Amino acid sequence: MSLLLFGLGLTLTPPALAEFSLAQIPPLSNKTPITLVAEKGFWTDYLTQEMLPKFTEKTGVKVNVISTELESMFELQTQALLMGEGKYDLLTMEAGWAKEWAANGYTVPLLELAKLYDPDGEKAMESYLEPYYPSLLNILSYNRELHAIPYNNYVMGSHYRADLFENKTEQAHFQQRFGYPLKPATNVEELADQAVFFTRKAGELLAEKPLTHDFYGLALMSGNKPHINDEFSSIIWSLGGAWMWPIYNQQKKLTHFEVPTVNQEAIKAGIAYRKLMPYAYPADDKFAFNEAADAMATGQVAIWPFAYNNLWHASFKVEANIPGARLGVSQVPGGTPYNGAYAFAVSYDSKNPQAAYWLLKYMGTFEAQYAYALGGGNPCRMDVVTAPEFKNASKKAIAGAFEASHVANLFWSTKVLELGHFTSTAMGQIYPELSRACYAASQHEANITDIFIELSTKIKQLQNTHGEVPAIDKKNK
């Protein structure tokens, strides 16, 4: 399947329904039980209690579930895949591993499976994929072939206290102080103004009421965790930069990457990030997405500017916890949110790839993604995200960020192919280095320029060691 297919016909309306149901699964010749690796939480509980029993009843194939934390999934599955003993039939992957696993031959292209097992062949899979966001399919593809079906979209949005932004007194004070209206930040400079403005000490007024505790402008995922890279990446992309640039030939085949020797946009992002930190909720080196969501939920901050929209339900608790609080969502400052998804794929050494294929399709149906949405997840299908009932105020607690996610995903449809972040088969090796460098650059005693010059050298080394195409220096203009 060509990657270009994943960029056609994009509008703000969903495509024609291309629905698959359990009833369409044909009789299976292979009844060997299969094993699914899935993340702990409500989604796996729903699969185990609702969907998998129906699948077994329909097909006669038993499904074993290995439920594990996301943090341990990569190592758990990679070790099994290296052994080639068919331990797992269906894998759960993070988008950053997708191309690496595909390049290693760990996962099977979906069209290859469709040709083998689907009565309608490739056309059935192409039709099945129509409702999915092209951005996510492009991220999960390798050599123009899709290997996985996404289910958990973690595209970013800016979660903010709408009640504070719309307060007349706060609006007047902000206008007087900064000379422009108080609205969700469209760039990191405006975000810095808002961070300063909303940071208050206990006893000061916030929306005409005295604070009983210190209040902060924003929450940053500034701990020594992977997520600080996602914030930095979003800022860098908004400045027109990248960690590495994919270069294509006239046939649109990837030939190599260019890595900036002195990454000016990364340096600017580091400076901007440091300016934000004094106005962020106090964070230790373990502070990440759960802590940031909690800071919003407990009324400690005005903005979580680089929030994962699949945590909207966590941020939204502020409306129950703080009288009068209302949560809003906008695009991230700069308009280039980090994006990706967790996805399911069939392993190369599956003992029953026929059943694994059909279960994969069943777990990605409208029914399944709708249930995922009702549980608080951020779905990957346009027809679910844009379902009319999710626009009702009664569904705001779970679906309040759906429209923002929809716009962000459409923005990234084919643009993800313009960034090395989403096109390198070595990103599983490179990503941890990005995270380490971003955390180091956030520390005030560190030399940002030196850190990112060293990082560029490391990126080249890792790409040239583990990647399929080389990386060379990109000379500064």
Question: What label would you give each PLM region?
Answer:
Residues E190-T199, S234-K286, R326-G328:
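Glycine-centered hinge/linker elements that transmit conformational signals in sensory
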Residues I34, P53-Y132, K168, D294-A295, ...:
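Extracytoplasmic "Venus flytrap"/periplasmic binding protein-like
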Residues T32, R144, L164, V259-P260, ...:
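Extracytoplasmic/periplasmic substrate-recognition and gating elements
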Residues S21-Q24, G41-K62, H159:
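Short, polar/charged alpha-helical segment
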Residues L28, P33-E50, T425:
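Extracytoplasmic "Venus flytrap"
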